[in-house]
Every structure is written in structure tokens, then in C-alpha cells.
């Protein structure tokens, strides 16, 4: 619930705006027109394009998802990206108050701005974005899914994740890693992986008896004439954060030494670029970049951080792509002599009103939701105030 102080500040600001002869916020912002071409505009660079999506949480359709108003960093993480919010975040990334990106990336004036800019995400819009990038960049594109994909919606609960599995089959990622997927249980996860059509990579998931890998730890892909080694890092604390009985025979952990060995093995096989597809969370990934040499790019998931610029840690590029289908990350790389000579990045906001739905994905979503339409349309209650995720606590 909004505090008395927050209400007073908001009410005072709104009154001042009108008293000064200004227009209501929604009318002031209506002039910022969003187009699909503008959202997809990008100055291409180099020979590799990494496209990253993560933490869909089975959200097939557009959502109103407010970014947190509090994001507490502990110790050395305090006050550093991504542990800044609101006005501080907007100052750090030079975002104008009330702009489309301010709405997408921060929490202030969320309800009012939502009336202007609308919902975000939707797998049919995400599909349009990804198809456009693939059409532009061809065989340079590597699409990677950071996990938390198959579960957490009503339709995914009813279908044991099959609605999202089928949606991702249309999206055609080259690889994925996992976290909440494991709450489907070992047998169901194995069943899905066997028919997935692309690898689930997780170097840090081992069977309890022999400590052997349950899934492939890594895979080499050729893109744009570059050999790319992709390592999967599933959420390391799954048995703690989720019920242990769901994955009784598997162990997790960060497995830093094993990760270093995986990097060395990939380099030995000729990999010119090492990408960690991670569900560790941003702070753990930043620490890994400091501690484990040889990682060129970390695509970070789990903590839902949407960061509009690359975070550079030594020689590692760290990318955080948000959640719930609100964003697609595009990272163009100029790879030469087994190193990154240059890069260009954009966190693409998926404004549902501005992006044309992909017809194939749209048809799948409608078919997947149709058997549950009565449940999905049921009104459970009405709130007096906005409900939202408070933050990371």
C-alpha cells in the first residue's frame, strides 16, 4: 500500500502541475509516439549478434509489470547497478521523467504512465522482435533463453509447462538454462528436454550418486564465422529456494572450479568467444566475472534486473534483460583474434501497442489459452490501490 508520505508527494506534484497551467500528465506524454521501427532501430556492428531473453515466467500475453521501488544491495553492492531505483536510476541512465523508457524501467507514476504507454511484453510481440533481428543479421544471430520460462502462469500450471514449451519451439532459441523449470519435477523436466529440439545447458547440475552432469554443460555454436562456446549455469540454490522433494536426486551450487574447467575445455576445442548463460542473479554474476577468468559475456537472469547499458567487469560484458517478456537484449559483437574488439548494445523495450504480433505465435497463444478462458476471465477481487511487486525483499 502507498504510504501517506508517498501519497502526499504525488498529490502535491500533480496539483502543482495543474496549478502551473500545465496539462495532466497523460496529455503531456501523448506526444511521444512509439513505433516498431523506432524500437527496433539499431546500428549493426561486428560479426556476432547475441539475443537474450530471460524470466518469462510463462507470461504469454502482455502484462502491466511495475519495476521495483526498492532494490537493496548488501555490502559492496549497495548503491551500485542494479541496486538503484526511481529518480536515481533515471539520472544514472539519462532517462527523462515520464518518458517511455522511464515507464518501462522505473516505478514512479506507474499507473498514470500505464494508461499512456500500455502493457508490455507478449510472446507474439517478442517473436516479432526476434524475427526482425534474424532477418537483419542472418547467420550471425545466437538466441539464448536464461530460464524461468516454463512455469508460473495458470495455463502453464494446467499444462505442466507445455504451453510455454510449444511457444518456445516457435521462438527457436539455440539454448536455454533453468530454475523454476525444476519445480515440474525431475521426470517431467527430462521428458521435455528429450523432445526440446535445442539443449538445456547446466554445468552446475549433477546427480547425487556419481556427481555426473544431468544435462550438457556447454555447447559450441558457429555464428558469423566465429566459434562461440556457451555454458549454462542453472540457479545454484534451487534446492533451498524451491522444495527439495521436487529434485531429490540432483545437486546444484555455483561450482566455480567446474566452471573454470568448462571454459578451459571449450577454449581447447577452438572456442573464440565464451558466453555464460546464467541464472545466478546479477550480483553473483558480477562476482563470477571478477573471480573466473576467460568469460567474455555473461547473460544474467533470475533477479529480473533490466539494465539499459552493458556493465563491464574487467574484460567481461555483463547483460541483464529484465523479466516477464518486457525486454529483449541485443548485443552485437566485433570478435577478432579470440577477443571482443568492440560491441553495441540495446535493451529493446517490448511495448505491446507499438509492435505487431507475430501471426504464428499469436495463433498458438490463442489456442493455448482457449481451454482456460473461463478461468482466466474470472474476477477474483477488486483492489482500492495498485498492487505491485515491492522490490527485492
What are the roles of these predicted feature ranges?
Residues 2-356, 360:
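Acidic, metal/ion-coordinating pockets
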Residues 356-393:
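Hard-cation-handling environments
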Amino acid at each position: 500500500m502507498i504510504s501517506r508520505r508517498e501519497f502526499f508527494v504525488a498529490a502535491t506534484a500533480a496539483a502543482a502541475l495543474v496549478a502551473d497551467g500545465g496539462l495532466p500528465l497523460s496529455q503531456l506524454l501523448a506526444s511521444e509516439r512509439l513505433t516498431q521501427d523506432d524500437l527496433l532501430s539499431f546500428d549493426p556492428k561486428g560479426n556476432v549478434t547475441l539475443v537474450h531473453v530471460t524470466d518469462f515466467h510463462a507470461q504469454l500475453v502482455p502484462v502491466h509489470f511495475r519495476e521495483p521501488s526498492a532494490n537493496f544491495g548488501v555490502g559492496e553492492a549497495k548503491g551500485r547497478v542494479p541496486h538503484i531505483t526511481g529518480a536515481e536510476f533515471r539520472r544514472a541512465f539519462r532517462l527523462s521523467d515520464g518518458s517511455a523508457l522511464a515507464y518501462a524501467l522505473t516505478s514512479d507514476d506507474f499507473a498514470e504512465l500505464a494508461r499512456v504507454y500500455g502493457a508490455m511484453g507478449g510472446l507474439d510481440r517478442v517473436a516479432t522482435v526476434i524475427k526482425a533481428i534474424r532477418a537483419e543479421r542472418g547467420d550471425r544471430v545466437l538466441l539464448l533463453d536464461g530460464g524461468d520460462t516454463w512455469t508460473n502462469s495458470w495455463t502453464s500450471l494446467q499444462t505442466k509447462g507445455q504451453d510455454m514449451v510449444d511457444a518456445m519451439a516457435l521462438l527457436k532459441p539455440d539454448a536455454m538454462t533453468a530454475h523454476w523449470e525444476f519445480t515440474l519435477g525431475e521426470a517431467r523436466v527430462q521428458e521435455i528436454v528429450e523432445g526440446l529440439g535445442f539443449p538445456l545447458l547446466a554445468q552446475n547440475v549433477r546427480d547425487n550418486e556419481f556427481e555426473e552432469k544431468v544435462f550438457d554443460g556447454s555447447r559450441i555454436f558457429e555464428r558469423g564465422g566465429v566459434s562461440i562456446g556457451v555454458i549454462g549455469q542453472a540457479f545454484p540454490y534451487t534446492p533451498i529456494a524451491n522444495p527439495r522433494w521436487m529434485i531429490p536426486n540432483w545437486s546444484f551450487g555455483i561450482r566455480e572450479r567446474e566452471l573454470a574447467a568448462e571454459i578451459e575445455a571449450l577454449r581447447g576445442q577452438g572456442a573464440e568467444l565464451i558466453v555464460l548463460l546464467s541464472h545466478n542473479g546479477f550480483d553473483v554474476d558480477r562476482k563470477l566475472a571478477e573471480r573466473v577468468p576467460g568469460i567474455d559475456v555473461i547473460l544474467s537472469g533470475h533477479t529480473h534486473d533490466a539494465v539499459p547499458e552493458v556493465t563491464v567487469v574487467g574484460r567481461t560484458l555483463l547483460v541483464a534483460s529484465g523479466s516477464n517478456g518486457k525486454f529483449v537484449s541485443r548485443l552485437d559483437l566485433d570478435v577478432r583474434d579470440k577477443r571482443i574488439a568492440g560491441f553495441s548494445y540495446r535493451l529493446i523495450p517490448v511495448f505491446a501497442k507499438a509492435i505487431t504480433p507475430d501471426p504464428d505465435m499469436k495463433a498458438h497463444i490463442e489456442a493455448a489459452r482457449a481451454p482456460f478462458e473461463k478461468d482466466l476471465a474470472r474476477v477474483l477481487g477488486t483492489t482500492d490501490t495498485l498492487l505491485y511487486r515491492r522490490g527485492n525483499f
